[in-house]
Regions:
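A short acidic, Gly/Pro-enriched loop at the edge of an enzyme's catalytic core
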Residues: 108-117
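Class I S-adenosylmethionine-dependent transferase superfamily signal
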Residues: 65, 138-139
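A short, conserved alpha-helix within the catalytic core of class I
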Residues: 126-138
Length: 230
């Protein structure tokens, strides 16, 4: 278990307290639709089912998912109180519930609740492996058997960046002075992610590496899909 009062989470909650931008430019990333959300193109498959956006920001991804399929519900969870309050007011007529999490797990969410979980430009901002593992392990708990987790992280060589330092995948850098690209994690090889997800309990894991989009902190992104066993 990760202590929710750790230095990194305290810094992150402080920086995100008033909210973030909604990053509408990332809707123009073709890989967002063709890889990250490609499974939603078969809209009938998701009719009446539940989806979740982890690190949902101001609701862009939730809104996009709602527009693609006839879901029962598409929820959002985020560390920022400002973001969650915004979404509760802005999307109050949508089929969505909104949760503010503690930064180390998603304990307010039910077991076996979601058929599809996504996350983008989020996990790459957490250079603390133990926190990422805690979050991903808890997201697995919330997936229904056979459910899909689709996410993206920064990928490339070395640890240099014009925006600030990068940490390796298994590093625990609790004393980062900033988040949201100021001190990211960088995946160096696909096997690190695949092996980690297998150890957590996911199955049928696939990855695709593509050039990054509107992200000068990483030359490439890795898109990952992993399933909960039936």
């Amino acid at each position: 278990m990760v202590n929710k009062d750790n230095n990194y989470t305290a810094m992150q909650k402080n920086q995100y307290s008033s909210g973030t931008t909604n990053h509408p430019e990332h809707n123009d990333n073709p890989n967002y639709w063709d890889i990250l959300l490609s499974d939603l193109k078969d809209s009938d498959k998701w009719s009446g089912k539940n989806a979740l956006d982890f690190a949902s920001g101001k609701g862009r991804n939730v809104s996009n998912m709602l527009s693609t399929c006839n879901w029962n519900r598409v929820d959002g969870v985020d560390i920022s109180e400002g973001n969650i309050e915004f979404c509760k007011n802005w999307y109050n007529a949508k089929l969505s519930d909104w949760y503010c999490n503690n930064g180390v797990d998603v304990s307010d969410l039910k077991d076996n609740e979601y058929d599809f979980i996504m996350s983008t430009i989020a996990l790459q901002h957490i250079p603390v492996y133990d926190i990422r593992k805690s979050l991903i392990t808890d997201l697995l708990r919330t997936l229904k058997p056979g459910g899909l987790f689709s996410f993206q992280m920064g990928f490339g060589e070395g640890l240099e960046s014009p925006l600030g330092p990068r940490s390796a995948y298994y590093t625990n850098f609790y004393n980062a002075h900033g988040t949201n690209s100021h001190h990211d994690v960088r995946v160096h090889n696909e096997s690190d992610v695949i092996d980690d997800l297998k150890n957590i309990g996911f199955v049928n894991i696939t990855t695709e590496v593509r050039p990054s989009f509107s992200d000068s902190g990483h030359t490439h992104w890795i898109y990952v899909k992993a399933y909960k066993s039936e």
